[in-house]
């Protein structure tokens, strides 16, 4: 009896899940490449490689911990991966991994001040020559606090051109990641929203930093994040060293200086750059329980 139940269950699983069906029908390939990839992973020390290709924006109002979460992510990558020995597939040898942070907020770890998005494009062009000379592999992390407001500066946002967008779309190949923060995802420039991967909604309770990860495209189609089911949730405990890891006064001073220099866009230009689209909840596939209830009651 139990054998029949298990057999029927296995057939249902194979029928419903293409990945399981593919693995079951290619047992020798799964075994061979499983061993081969595991050996390569250990031999090339891939566990030391810093993950790149992220285009994430942390969102939340004042006191929600969006900048705290942004800095926690960026400094965590530096502390974990900088100086590690990694395999460079282009040169076919082991080199030292170098984590280069471009940030407009003062950090407790080494960083270069981010004055313009052109620096991100420049990093994709000059780091290879630097790496060849110093036997390194540079990972570039762009950290942009108050991204929505920063893009209101002409000198900062004028670099959002096809070259910059192409760099972002191929950022994994250039070993680049971009992390930003904004009060609301809709406050960010439309061109940036179109290439964003994840939106992280932040909520802080005492020293408990609770964050929810959303697909950026699905969040683009609703006005209320509660209508979308999070991809995942996480929480971490905030320590004193996390508060000391950054200073946002540099961001405020830079914005004040740009305003005094009349470098900011007009209100009409700001609203046009945001290009708010009409919400299309029907385009959301990962609806929350609240959204499904609203749909049923229509």
Protein language model features and the residues they cover:
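Conserved nucleotide-sensing/catalytic segment adjacent to the nucleotide-binding pocket
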Residues: 106-170
């Amino acid at each position: 009896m139990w054998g029949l139940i298990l057999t029927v269950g296995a057939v249902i699983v194979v029928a419903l899940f293409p990945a399981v069906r593919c693995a079951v029908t290619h047992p020798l390939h799964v075994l061979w490449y499983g061993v081969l990839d595991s050996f390569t992973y250990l031999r090339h020390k891939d566990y030391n490689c810093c993950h790149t290709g992220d285009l994430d924006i942390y969102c939340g109002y004042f006191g929600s911990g969006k900048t705290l979460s942004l800095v926690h992510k960026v400094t965590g990558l530096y502390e974990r991966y900088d100086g590690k020995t990694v395999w460079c597939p282009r040169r076919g040898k082991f080199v030292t991994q170098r984590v280069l942070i471009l940030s407009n907020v003062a950090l407790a770890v080494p960083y270069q001040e981010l004055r313009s998005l052109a620096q991100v494009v420049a990093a994709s062009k000059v780091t290879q020559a630097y790496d060849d000379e110093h036997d390194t592999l540079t990972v570039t992390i762009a950290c942009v606090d108050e991204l929505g407001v920063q893009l209101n500066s002409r000198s900062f946002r004028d670099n959002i051109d096809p070259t910059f967008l192409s760099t972002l779309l191929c950022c994994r190949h250039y070993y680049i990641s971009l992390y930003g923060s904004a009060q609301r995802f809709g406050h960010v420039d439309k061109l940036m929203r179109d290439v964003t991967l994840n939106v992280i909604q932040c909520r802080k309770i005492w020293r408990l930093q609770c964050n929810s990860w959303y697909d950026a495209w699905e969040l683009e189609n609703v006005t209320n994040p509660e209508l979308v089911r999070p991809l995942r949730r996480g929480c971490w405990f905030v320590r004193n060293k996390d508060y000391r890891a950054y200073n946002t006064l540099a961001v405020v001073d830079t914005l004040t200086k740009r305003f005094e220099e009349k470098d900011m866009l007009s209100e009409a230009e700001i609203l046009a750059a945001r290009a708010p689209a009409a919400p299309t909840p029907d385009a959301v596939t990962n609806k929350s329980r609240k959204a499904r209830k609203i749909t049923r009651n229509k």
